[in-house]
């Protein structure tokens, strides 16, 4: 019981992991290289510094990330407690004073008697129980060691993710199921376009606003994966020879080949989520919504994850991790945070919470806990370890990842309330066993 756990990185995930360990009586060696070595995005030496927005998104239980927060409150999350204490008015969202928030987390974790903080860069993966939570801007030296550990093909340095939509929100009268040239099983939903519809879509796409690039993203940005808006600007017909190619996708209703086709590919095992093939994008989210709703069948599409392209060091978790956030080849090594493929502040902290709980259980000689995918916490762990390893991209919390209810509820709010009610009952039962 006198073993020490190394936690590398004092961001949202690392700070939460350290707290969960320390409160269970486990000694923690918490490494944070700032301020000795800064990242291109951070400005302080504080733990859990929010480098982008100051919003932790929705607080309502009719939203998956709101359910995730409530689950974390049940499990005594340091991050959510700090956010609640440092909140600022933000309507239905939980937003914080970022300076007070970081100071709160830093003080709480740093002052715990079981935590020793070391401000130094870690350049080797330590032996003994360890949680790696170094985030999307992991240092070059540690990235090199992670590449050695995971293999060249399992470590990525940027996101290039297409939008994901809920199948239930699509107009199925306008789309059809088919694979190109009818090869294999019919695996894609196809949205056919006339020339007029394509022209309208094209004009909206090339005039939409993009997110400005940060300086440290520019060098790696377009390696091997071109945003759909950049492709469009190369010529009006470029997309017709790329992701919107209609060849081999005749519409079964007409027997004719459409002028253009947008394909959607199943993204989860339950078949509730679909990604838009080849539509990785850097458009602003409001513009994405407007442009995508010009696609036939997607007029009322619910977007559960917007397309993103940004610097992000992450591993191929389906190949490498268990749902307990343990490395498959080494039980005393855990990963947490955005590095695992969870997307978002709250999701990152939640993964740290699970890694911290399970590292403590390992030292205590107990079985690591696998959270049910009836919960938001468990649905994230399930997604990053069970999804298709060939097309793995980071994901944020959404009800499409939850285990299905088993009953069809048409009203979206009622359906989400049922997801929330079941999740919180499950998490309270789990919390009694921890």
Swiss-Prot record:
Entry's Gene Ontology BP terms: tRNA methylation; tRNA wobble uridine modification
Gene Ontology MF, one: tRNA (uracil(54)-C5)-methyltransferase activity, 5,10-methylenetetrahydrofolate-dependent
Naturally occurring in which organism (per UniProt): Bacillus licheniformis (strain ATCC 14580 / DSM 13 / JCM 2505 / CCUG 7422 / NBRC 12200 / NCIMB 9375 / NCTC 10341 / NRRL NRS-1264 / Gibson 46)
GO CC aspect terms: cytosol
The protein's Enzyme Commission number: 2.1.1.74
First-level EC class: transferase
Protein family per UniProt: Belongs to the MnmG family. TrmFO subfamily.
PANTHER family associated with the record: GLUCOSE INHIBITED DIVISION PROTEIN A, METHYLENETETRAHYDROFOLATE--TRNA-(URACIL-5-)-METHYLTRANSFERASE TRMFO
Requisite cofactors: FAD
Catalyzed reaction equations: uridine(54) in tRNA + (6R)-5,10-methylene-5,6,7,8-tetrahydrofolate + NADH + H(+) = 5-methyluridine(54) in tRNA + (6S)-5,6,7,8-tetrahydrofolate + NAD(+); uridine(54) in tRNA + (6R)-5,10-methylene-5,6,7,8-tetrahydrofolate + NADPH + H(+) = 5-methyluridine(54) in tRNA + (6S)-5,6,7,8-tetrahydrofolate + NADP(+)
Binding site for FAD: 9-14
GN (gene name): trmFO
Compartment(s) of residence: Cytoplasm
Pfam families linked: GIDA
Function recorded in the entry: Catalyzes the folate-dependent formation of 5-methyl-uridine at position 54 (M-5-U54) in all tRNAs.
Protein name: Methylenetetrahydrofolate--tRNA-(uracil-5-)-methyltransferase TrmFO
Alphabetically ordered keywords of this record: Cytoplasm, FAD, Flavoprotein, Methyltransferase, NAD, NADP, Transferase, tRNA processing
């Amino acid at each position: 019981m006198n073993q020490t756990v190394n936690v590398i990185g004092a961001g949202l995930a690392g700070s939460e992991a350290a707290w969960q360990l320390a409160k269970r009586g486990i000694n923690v060696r918490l490494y944070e290289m700032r301020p000795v070595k800064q990242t291109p995005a951070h400005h302080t030496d504080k733990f859990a510094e929010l480098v982008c927005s100051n919003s932790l998104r929705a607080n309502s239980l009719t939203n998956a990330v709101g359910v995730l927060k409530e689950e974390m409150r049940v499990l005594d999350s340091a991050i959510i407690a700090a956010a609640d204490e440092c909140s600022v008015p933000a309507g239905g969202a939980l937003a914080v004073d970022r300076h007070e928030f970081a100071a709160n987390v830093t003080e709480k974790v740093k002052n715990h008697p079981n935590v020793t903080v070391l401000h130094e860069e870690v350049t080797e993966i330590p032996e003994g129980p360890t949680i790696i939570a170094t985030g999307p801007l992991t240092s070059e030296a540690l990235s090199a060691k992670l590449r050695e550990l995971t293999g060249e093909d399992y470590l990525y340095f940027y996101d290039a993710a297409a939008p994901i939509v809920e199948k239930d929100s699509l107009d199925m009268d306008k789309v059809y199921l088919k694979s190109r040239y009818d090869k294999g099983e019919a695996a894609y939903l196809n949205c056919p376009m006339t020339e007029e519809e394509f022209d309208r879509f094209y004009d909206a796409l090339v005039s939409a606003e993009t997110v400005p690039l940060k300086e440290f993203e520019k060098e790696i940005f377009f390696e091997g994966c071109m945003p759909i808006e950049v492709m469009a600007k190369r010529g009006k017909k470029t997309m017709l020879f790329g992701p919107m190619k209609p060849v081999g996708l005749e519409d079964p209703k007409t027997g004719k080949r459409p002028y253009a086709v947008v394909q959607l590919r199943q993204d989860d095992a339950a078949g509730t989520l679909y990604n838009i093939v080849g539509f990785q994008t850097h458009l602003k989210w409001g513009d994405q919504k407007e442009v995508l709703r010009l696609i036939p069948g997607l007029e009322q599409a619910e977007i559960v994850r917007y397309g993103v392209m940004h610097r992000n060091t992450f591993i191929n978790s389906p190949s490498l991790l268990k749902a307990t956030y343990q490395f498959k080849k080494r039980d005393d090594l855990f990963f947490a945070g955005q590095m695992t493929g969870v997307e978002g502040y709250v999701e990152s902290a939640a993964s740290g919470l699970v890694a911290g709980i399970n590292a403590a259980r390992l030292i205590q000689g107990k079985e690591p806990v696998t959270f049910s995918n009836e919960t938001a916490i468990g649905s994230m762990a399930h997604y990053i370890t069970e999804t298709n390893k060939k097309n793995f991209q980071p994901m944020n919390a959404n009800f499409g990842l939850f285990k299905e209810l088993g009953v069809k509820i048409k009203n979206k709010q009622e359906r989400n309330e049922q997801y929330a009610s079941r999740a919180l009952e499950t998490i309270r039962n789990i919390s009694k066993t921890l």
